[in-house]
Every structure is written in C-alpha cells, then in structure tokens.
C-alpha cells in the first residue's frame, strides 16, 4: 500500500512537470549537442551528456511547475486545465512551489558542473542560460506579461531558445553566437506559432479568465492571419542555417537540412493557409499538433547533416 501511494505521488509530480513540453526542449538540447559534436569532431563524455540533459530537463520542468503554481487560480476555471494536479487538489500549492524551486536549484547546479567535465567558460555559459531561461519564463512571461500583454508569448518566449544553446555550449564555444544562436532562434520563433494555434483552439477558455492571448482576443479571421504570418516567418527562419559559415570556413549545414527545411516548411505553411481559409478551432488544432513534430524534424535534419560531415 505504501509503495503504491509513493508511486502515485511520483506520478502526480511527474504530471505536474508537464513532460510533453520538456521532452521536446530536451530533444532540442540533444540535437544541438549532436550537431556541434559532429561538426567539430568533439567527443562528448557520459558525464557531460548527463549534466547537460538533466539540467535542461530539470530547468524546463521547474519553469512548468512554477508557472502552474502561479496560474493555479485560472487553471481551476479553464476547462482545459481543471484536471491538472494543482486545481484538482492532488498537489498542494506549497508542495508544487517547493518542488519547482528544488528543480530550479538542481538545474543550476548541474549546469554549472558542466565546468568540471569541459571548461569553466562552458559551465558558466550553461548556468547563465539556465538562469536566463527560468527568469524569462517564470518572472517575465508568467508573472509580468501573461495576464497583461497580448504580445506576452513573444517577449516571454526567449526562454525556449536556451536549451539548444546549452546543448551547443556543453560541447564547444566555437560558433556559439552564430550556429548556436540560430538553433536557439528556431525554438524562439517557433513558440508564438505553436502557442497561438493552441490559444485559438481554446479561445473561449482564455477569454473566460481574461488572459489576453493575441489569438484569443482578436477575431478568428485576424487570429488566423497572425498565425499564418508567424508560420511563414518560422519557415523562412528555418533556412537561416544555410547562410552560416563556420569558423573553419565550412558551410554550417548541407543538402539534407535544406531539403528537410524546405519540405517541412512548405507543409506547415500549407496548414497555416488552411487556418486562414477556414479559421476554426479544428484547423488551429491540426496546426498545433503538427508544430511540435515539425520542430523535432528540423533538429533531426541538423543532426543527420552533422553526422554526414563527420
């Protein structure tokens, strides 16, 4: 009985961390590390892998938990979120807050410890990226912007770009502010499209609690056009790696990434065009469900290209 209760408690806190979100972010960190390793021929130690992946997982989970803690009042009202651990009473507010703070501290420590398996500079950058991501997501987005500004997810979405940069800097600081930054930019620019498609689908829920998500407060037609513009921007930015020349003079990516970015970009633009043509919750939901695999495919292509280089 005690064992079953313990397992149930672990499962509830795991659910509270919103794993579907941090799985994708951890994957982008993994993809950036694999790409950097392949490009520069740098072997990544098991310890570095563990510190990098677990720090990103803990940091992302922490942001989700602390955001849920702050939003527990509106989550109890919105149909989409009423069954989450906090509004359903399966986790206490104090328990959620303490769990989130523990994860935040653990993520910072693990990121800083990358200095022990690589260089002090790499560890310092990894810890700085974790700290910025937490600050931007929890304080800037959740506490300052989410309930006040229609552009909340734009300014509050910078945190999404941190996992790929952590993955890159755990391998090398070379081209961190070119290729590493562009990888982070892929997630940052992808975020509004992804979230706006979700909020269009659940616009009534967001309006019920007076959260001014851009695609919830505007008409469906205007919202659909905003989503389409952000989708086109994402598809165009996904071609940015093709413009980058690395420090050794070589191109950052090759034909595999070009073909993947072009094909997947055309598909997601077509889906956004469907949302414009038929601005319904169903169309927005289809775009939302496709957006995560789309981002994952881009990072897979980056890894494959880097592997072919090696």
Swiss-Prot record:
The enzyme's E.C. designation: 2.5.1.141
Catalytic activity: heme b + (2E,6E)-farnesyl diphosphate + H2O = Fe(II)-heme o + diphosphate
Gene Ontology biological process terms in this record: heme O biosynthetic process
Parts of the chain that traverse the membrane: 21-41, 46-66, 99-119, 125-145, 153-173, 180-200, 226-246, 256-276, 284-304
Chief location bin: membrane
Keyword Cell membrane: yes
Pathway linked to the protein: Porphyrin-containing compound metabolism; heme O biosynthesis; heme O from protoheme: step 1/1
Keyword annotations of the record: Cell membrane, Heme biosynthesis, Membrane, Transferase, Transmembrane, Transmembrane helix
Matches recorded under InterPro entries: Protohaem_IX_farnesylTrfase (IPR006369), UbiA_prenyltransferase (IPR000537), UbiA_sf (IPR044878)
Compartments where found: Cell membrane
Note from the entry: Carbon 2 of the heme B porphyrin ring is defined according to the Fischer nomenclature.
PANTHER family for this protein: PROTOHEME IX FARNESYLTRANSFERASE, MITOCHONDRIAL (PTHR43448:SF2)
Family membership: Belongs to the UbiA prenyltransferase family. Protoheme IX farnesyltransferase subfamily.
Cited function: Converts heme B (protoheme IX) to heme O by substitution of the vinyl group on carbon 2 of heme B porphyrin ring with a hydroxyethyl farnesyl side group.
Record-given protein name: Protoheme IX farnesyltransferase 2
Gene expressing this chain: ctaB2
């Amino acid at each position: 009985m005690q064992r079953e209760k313990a397992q149930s408690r672990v499962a509830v806190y795991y659910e509270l961390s919103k794993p579907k979100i941090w799985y994708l972010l951890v994957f982008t960190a993994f993809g950036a590390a694999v790409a950097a390793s392949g490009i520069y021929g740098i072997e990544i130690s098991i310890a570095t892998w563990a510190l990098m992946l677990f720090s990103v997982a803990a940091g992302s989970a922490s942001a989700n938990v602390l955001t849920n803690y702050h939003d527990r009042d509106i989550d109890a009202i919105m149909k989409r979120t009423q069954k989450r651990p906090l509004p359903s009473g399966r986790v206490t507010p104090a328990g959620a807050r303490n769990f989130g703070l523990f994860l935040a501290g653990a993520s910072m420590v693990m990121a800083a410890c990358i200095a022990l398996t690589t260089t002090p500079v790499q560890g310092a950058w990894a810890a700085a990226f974790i700290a910025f991501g937490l600050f931007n997501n929890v304080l800037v987005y959740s506490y300052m912007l989410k309930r006040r500004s229609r552009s909340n997810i734009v300014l509050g979405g910078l945190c999404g770009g941190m996992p790929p940069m952590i993955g890159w800097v755990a391998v090398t600081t070379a081209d961190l502010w070119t290729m590493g930054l562009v990888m982070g930019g892929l997630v940052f620019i992808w975020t509004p499209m992804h979230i706006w498609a979700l909020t269009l689908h659940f616009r009534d829920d967001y309006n019920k609690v007076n959260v001014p998500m851009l695609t919830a407060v505007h008409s469906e037609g205007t919202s659909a056009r905003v989503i389409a513009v952000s989708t086109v921007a994402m598809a165009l930015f996904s071609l940015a790696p093709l413009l980058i020349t690395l420090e050794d003079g070589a191109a950052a990516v090759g034909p595999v990434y070009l073909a993947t970015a072009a094909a997947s970009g055309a598909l997601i633009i077509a889906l956004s065009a469907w949302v414009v043509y038929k601005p319904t919750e169903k169309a927005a939901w289809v775009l939302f469900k496709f957006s995560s695999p789309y981002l994952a495919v881009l990072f897979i292509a980056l890894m494959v290209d880097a592997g072919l280089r090696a």
